[in-house]
Amino acid sequence: MMRHLLSAGDLTRDDALLILDTAAELARLADRPIKKLPTLRGRTIVNLFYEDSTRTRTSFEAAAKRLSADVINFSAKGSSVSKGESLKDTALTLEAMGTDAVVIRHWASGAPHRLAGWVRGSVINAGDGTHEHPTQALLDAYTIRRHLGGVDGRRVAIVGDILHSRVARSNVTLLHTLGAEVTLVAPPTLLPVGVESWPCAVSYELDGVLPKCDAVMLLRVQRERMQAAFFPTSREYSRRYGLDAARLALLPEHAIVLHPGPMNRGVEIAAEVADSPRSVVVEQVANGVVVRMAVLYLLLGGGEPALAGRAAEPAAAAIGGGW
């Protein structure tokens, strides 16, 4: 059984399907008046965030609390980190407090791997630099599966700033593991060196890719990570790579539009597309909670059935142990 979730590459197909199946069972809680389960009562989970976050931090907090865990939110701002404390010393402090799991977001690629060597509890990567964001990939796969009936054989286009995107890296890996055909669409300046070795296709033209897509994922341009000009203007970028109403019409009728957020409306996605029935952006946020509940549950080895009563019976095998 794995102790950590550091990379989408850590997951076998069976691992990923177990998480998605467990999340589907836990999603039944959303329709209940009381959404909490006692499965992680007495466990302590720390959200250790060195970068700003709205969706991911609050999603992990909601997931942990719905499993009855005690949650400590740690922000680098206002902590001893601002006084020069190293990641290792912070880790040793958390270890001394008896933390069961640490959810870490860090500006440095590889920080979660380092942390995993310093603590006895589980470590979950909530985004490290431009490297990976495995739970985002899991919730995206979960969303695709809910709408399209499965991931295997589906054609997914990921469009935008691939160079700086940890979401793109994790999605390419996980979607390939689950049998999807992935195409990256971006200007050459926003593609990383070595992308030809990734398990996906690459295109510089969006219009030719859209008619063959089952799902299209838009990525924002991460200007905060850019030290130079990667394209002439935002208007020119939007003209070539933005998803507007005209391009939305090129998609098959069943295709869905995803975005990990935050969105830059009018740049990579037009407002009318973001708010259209084809957009599942808000649903991705809701799905993120149940997927992260599943990850926490399986990593921390919950021994009780996740759902009480007859509704839990089909899930007994999937939710009984961990992976």
Swiss-Prot record:
Role? Catalyzes the condensation of carbamoyl phosphate and aspartate to form carbamoyl aspartate and inorganic phosphate, the committed step in the de novo pyrimidine nucleotide biosynthesis pathway.
Query: GO annotations under biological process?
Result: 'de novo' pyrimidine nucleobase biosynthetic process; 'de novo' UMP biosynthetic process; amino acid metabolic process
UniProt cross-references to PANTHER family, sorted A to Z: ASPARTATE CARBAMOYLTRANSFERASE, ORNITHINE CARBAMOYLTRANSFERASE, MITOCHONDRIAL
Q: Which Pfam family, any one of them, does this sequence belong to?
A: OTCace
Q: Which reactions are catalysed by this chain?
A: carbamoyl phosphate + L-aspartate = N-carbamoyl-L-aspartate + phosphate + H(+)
- Per its record, how is this protein called by name? Aspartate carbamoyltransferase catalytic subunit
Enzyme kind, highest EC tier: transferase
Q: What is its EC number?
A: 2.1.3.2
- What parts of the sequence cross the membrane? none
Q: Quote the record's binding site residues for L-aspartate.
A: 83, 166, 220
Residues that hold carbamoyl phosphate according to the record: 55-56, 105, 133, 136, 261-262
Keywords from the named record: Pyrimidine biosynthesis, Transferase
**Summary of subunit composition and partner proteins:** Heterododecamer (2C3:3R2) of six catalytic PyrB chains organized as two trimers (C3), and six regulatory PyrI chains organized as three dimers (R2).
Gene Ontology molecular function: any one: amino acid binding
Q: Provide the family line.
A: Belongs to the aspartate/ornithine carbamoyltransferase superfamily. ATCase family.
The annotated pathway is: Pyrimidine metabolism; UMP biosynthesis via de novo pathway; (S)-dihydroorotate from bicarbonate: step 2/3
GO terms under cellular component: cytosol
